[in-house]
Amino acid sequence: MSKAKTHSGAAKRFKKTASGYKHKHAFKSHILTKMTTKRKRQLRGTSLLNAADKPAVDRMLRAN
């Protein structure tokens, strides 16, 4: 059986913490002129991964 590999795309996007996985918000890279200042401010920083997505990310990062 081959070695388990970490999903390199997921490894770049998610950081494991004691309370779950930390990730950046989507929709914050380009074409931001249409977006209100309030919305851009809300998308700043990081947030924790939703519990429903945790098993999938666990599988992708299983080799860590």
From Swiss-Prot:
Transmembrane segments: none annotated. SUPFAM superfamilies: L35p-like (SSF143034). GO terms for biological process: translation. GO terms for cellular component: cytosolic large ribosomal subunit. Residues 1-28 have a biased composition (Basic residues). Residues 1-51 are annotated as: Disordered. Pfam families: Ribosomal_L35p (PF01632). Keywords: Ribonucleoprotein, Ribosomal protein. One of its GO terms (molecular function) is structural constituent of ribosome. HAMAP family: Ribosomal_bL35. Belongs to the bacterial ribosomal protein bL35 family. This is Large ribosomal subunit protein bL35. It comes from Saccharophagus degradans (strain 2-40 / ATCC 43961 / DSM 17024). The lineage of its organism: Bacteria, Pseudomonadati, Pseudomonadota, Gammaproteobacteria, Cellvibrionales. The gene is rpmI.
